[in-house]
Structures are given as C-alpha cells and as structure tokens.
Amino acid sequence: MKPFRLYAITGEEFHPGRDVVEVMEEAIQGGVDIIQLRDKTSSKKAVLEKARRLKKLAADYGIPFIVNDHIDVALAVDASGVHVGQDDLPLPEVRKLLGPDKIIGVSTHKLEEALEAEKNGADYIGVGPIFPTNSKADVVDPVTTAYIREVKEHVTIPFVAIGGIKRHNVREVIEAGAEAICVITEIVAARDVKAASQALLAAMEEASQ
C-alpha cells in the first residue's frame, strides 16, 4: 500500500441534492488520494451501486477505494480493501475472506487496540476521534492528540488521524506526529469541495515545515 495523506469518507447527509460521485471527484481533484464509501443506512443494493460507481472513479484517478464494513460489497466490486471497526468481523476473519493482497484498515481508540490490529495484520489503522465530531452518532469520547503520540511511538504500520479534524486544528494533529488525516464534513459539506481539500493539504504542508 503506497502512502496517502488525505483520506476522504463519503457523507451524503452533509451534501443533500448532490451526487456522491460528483462530490468525491471534486475532492480527488483537490488532492484527496484515497476514498472510502461509508453508508450505514441505504439498502445493500443501493450501497453496491454506489460502490461500483466510486470504484470506477477511484480507478480512473489511480487511487485506492475502500468500503466501510460491507465486506460482501467490497468483494463484489473488487474494491481496494475494507475498513472495519472494533465491533465488526475480527480482522483475521476479514483477511480470510479478502485474501492477502487487499487493504484492511481498522478503527482504534486506544493503544491496546492499535497494537492488536498491527499484530493481526492490519495494513493501516484509524486513530481517533481526535476531536469531538458530529458525523458519527455512536463515537467514543475524543482521544485527543495524546493518542497520536502514543501510536507514533509504539506502532509501526501506517495510521491516519480522524475525528473532528478541520483546517483550523490540523496543525495540532500534524505536530503530534500524524502524516495522514481522514475527514468527512470538512470536505464533503463544503460549498467548494475541491478548494476545501486543497486548503486542508496546504495547512498540513505548512504544519509539517
């Protein structure tokens, strides 16, 4: 898996009336280099149709396409991989289903979970939520940038910081040791999605100096 910097997750509830593929294409044009379909409410058929279209989009731009949770959908569209949470199918079982070459990401909220994911062969981990977020109703309390520092020190696989990350607070995240961030609303809810992506990347670069 090649390194990525800016990871965008779909959030159709934040751009009513706009097509998800159109929004994600603008995000990619702004510098997003990996995308994930996250849909907890639509029918499986609808999720599959979106996944097909997003897979084609990602392929056209030469970037990975990840499916959140729906392993069957990921297999059906030959996605680059899946992202699973702590309450989803255990990582070793996911690997059996997907095979050795697909990307598997795992959400983690504490160091114990991060180390477990690494031991079980995760390709990357999500680290968060760093800040309070309203894009997920079932999230745990914010883990703060202290968790980024812990992961940076103890975990060797790639990680991506997620949760409430905005242009105004991304410096804290980068200075804590994150090299990649994952966002939903800061990109997909923006009036100008491409510009929002570019602004986040610019803020990350500035913080990295």
From Swiss-Prot:
Pathway: Cofactor biosynthesis; thiamine diphosphate biosynthesis; thiamine phosphate from 4-amino-2-methyl-5-diphosphomethylpyrimidine and 4-methyl-5-(2-phosphoethyl)-thiazole: step 1/1
Protein residues bound to 2-[(2R,5Z)-2-carboxy-4-methylthiazol-5(2H)-ylidene]ethyl phosphate: 133-135, 164, 184-185
Any one Gene Ontology molecular-function term assigned to this protein's record: thiamine-phosphate diphosphorylase activity
GO CC term (a single one): cytoplasm
Co-factor remark: Binds 1 Mg(2+) ion per subunit.
Enzyme Commission number: 2.5.1.3
Catalytic reaction list: 2-[(2R,5Z)-2-carboxy-4-methylthiazol-5(2H)-ylidene]ethyl phosphate + 4-amino-2-methyl-5-(diphosphooxymethyl)pyrimidine + 2 H(+) = thiamine phosphate + CO2 + diphosphate; 2-(2-carboxy-4-methylthiazol-5-yl)ethyl phosphate + 4-amino-2-methyl-5-(diphosphooxymethyl)pyrimidine + 2 H(+) = thiamine phosphate + CO2 + diphosphate; 4-methyl-5-(2-phosphooxyethyl)-thiazole + 4-amino-2-methyl-5-(diphosphooxymethyl)pyrimidine + H(+) = thiamine phosphate + diphosphate
Residues reported in the UniProt entry to bind 4-amino-2-methyl-5-(diphosphooxymethyl)pyrimidine: 36-40, 68, 107, 136
Amino acids binding Mg(2+): 69, 88
Protein name: Thiamine-phosphate synthase
